[in-house]
């Protein structure tokens, strides 16, 4: 297989929630491989503009578009704008999401709705609009989690459930999207060192609120036989593979990316 099959030259990608963290890394990695990129954000405008600057500095084109993925009309408008600006849309990576922790007895209806609005409903309609806007042979890449179906986590039912739905979406959407030769897959990250990593990682560790940042790192790294914590670029590189011609026969799959932590 030619290495060119991993390039994305001439492609246009849109990444939701890409102003920071994993989404930013996905957008930057797509740009490094030749794609022009739409950087979506909801509130982090300054951060999104920095991601755009980085992509442009690396040699491709990029724009930032504000949209709340929980609002269907905004999602549709964002993709209209992407096609209007670049003339096409080939790759949609749905990354925007919320995290939530809470014991079963304490979870409110408002919290349930807040999380499912973005993580589940939002991703469904991002995928729907992606299907409607993508060129034939396009790519839809959703975001699940390694807590969705592999391992239960205390006080994490709402988040894990919201991501578990993604696994089912992917399997069914891959069938529906086949008529446009569009592949549908998901990445399921484990512990990834983003700007919110230290605070969130403590929730997974019994007594983690008493751990130093270094101890949190050690604990997360211990779970992986590779003995390190994941980085946003680890996710970005896998998304780039799924977006490339090299993955044209991969569809309906959920790829766990956790360094072998859950096995």
UniProtKB/Swiss-Prot annotation:
Primary enzyme class: oxidoreductase
GO cellular component, one term: cytosol
Keywords from the named record: Cytoplasm, NADP, Oxidoreductase
Subcellular location, principal: cytoplasm
Phenotype upon loss of function: Blocks the production of dothistromin and accumulates versicolorin A.
Binding site for NADP(+): 22, 68, 95, 128, 159, 163, 192, 194
Pfam families per the UniProt record, alphabetical: adh_short_C2
Pathway where this protein functions: Mycotoxin biosynthesis
UniProt EC number: 1.1.-.-
UniProt KW Cytoplasm keyword: yes
Molecular-function GO terms, alphabetical: oxidoreductase activity, acting on CH-OH group of donors
Keyword RNA-binding: no
Induction context: Expression is positively regulated by the dothistromin-specific transcription factors aflR and aflJ. Dothistromin biosynthetic proteins are co-regulated, showing a high level of expression at ealy exponential phase with a subsequent decline in older cultures.
Cellular localization per UniProt: Cytoplasm, Cytosol
Active-site residues from the entry: 144 (proton donor), 145 (proton donor), 159 (proton acceptor), 163 (lowers pka of active site tyr)
Family note: Belongs to the short-chain dehydrogenases/reductases (SDR) family.
Protein purpose: Versicolorin reductase; part of the fragmented gene cluster that mediates the biosynthesis of dothistromin (DOTH), a polyketide toxin very similar in structure to the aflatoxin precursor, versicolorin B. The first step of the pathway is the conversion of acetate to norsolorinic acid (NOR) and requires the fatty acid synthase subunits hexA and hexB, as well as the polyketide synthase pksA. PksA combines a hexanoyl starter unit and 7 malonyl-CoA extender units to synthesize the precursor NOR.
Protein name: Versicolorin reductase 1
